[in-house]
């Protein structure tokens, strides 16, 4: 399979000479991505909003690569102020809570003082049946459904559990 280059349209990609993402076989390498909204070339001054925008930008790049956030296997976070990382946890959990990729966080300066976080991901595309792509929400719902016991099994456990305890300890009168 040929290498595929993906662009977000960010002016930085052309100026510096890099791709938002590179697809090589089943692997997708997404460059360090900041919280810029590439349509407006604006950035929030709030780290939580920047984190959300970073992950939206990454999700869009993965989609162009025929991958999704569910395919992410490694994430690197870079923050100029490491003490702000905890503020990002709810947003990160929203995107990666079920995926649980390998992660590393670094404290380092970024290219612009307005940038409060930069996120880089590596994804490995999962095998999918030809012509069928499962939306993330449906896939998560299916996994959750598989983990839940059938209602009849729950009722049987509730009914049988006390009987087992009584049989082991005392006889019924």
Model regions and ranges:
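N-terminal presequence-like segments and the immediate start of the first folded domain
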Residues: 1-56, 60-65, 70, 79-173
């Amino acid at each position: 399979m040929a290498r595929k280059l993906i662009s977000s349209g960010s002016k930085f990609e052309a100026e510096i000479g890099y791709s938002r993402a590179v697809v090589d076989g089943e692997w997708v390498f997404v460059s360090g991505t900041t919280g810029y909204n590439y349509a407006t070339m604006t950035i929030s001054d709030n780290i939580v909003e920047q984190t959300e925008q970073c992950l939206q930008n990454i999700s869009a790049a993965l989609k162009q690569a025929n991958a999704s956030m569910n395919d992410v296997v490694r994430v690197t976070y870079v923050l100029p102020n490491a003490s702000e990382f905890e503020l990002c946890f709810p947003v990160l959990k929203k995107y990666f809570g079920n995926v649980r990729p390998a992660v590393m966080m670094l404290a380092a300066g970024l290219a612009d003082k307005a940038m409060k976080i930069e996120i880089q991901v590596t994804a490995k595309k999962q095998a999918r049946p030809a012509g069928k792509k499962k939306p993330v929400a449906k896939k998560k719902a299916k996994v959750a459904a598989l983990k839940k016991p059938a209602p009849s099994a729950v009722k049987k456990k509730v009914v049988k559990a006390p009987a087992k305890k009584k049989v082991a300890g005392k006889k019924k009168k």
